């Protein structure tokens, strides 16, 4: 099986880290989550198909925006966003615990 390769623009990576607090090097780990969710970004896929990966990283659900370029995954955005967490939990049927009444 071929090993997945990741790439990104270093300037864009630094901008993302400054703005959202997530390095693209960390974002790669969302793809390792066996329960990750991959979805096509239908609202921004005009010239090339863009995708989201929602995966658990460091006890939070990380949303990674990326494109496939041959056998390479090119990351162009990442952050811990509520909507990504909601999608991840819905697709994995994760339910919040409600405290029991005594």
What positions do the PLM features span?
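Ribonuclease/tRNase effector modules and their secretory precursors
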Residues: 1-102
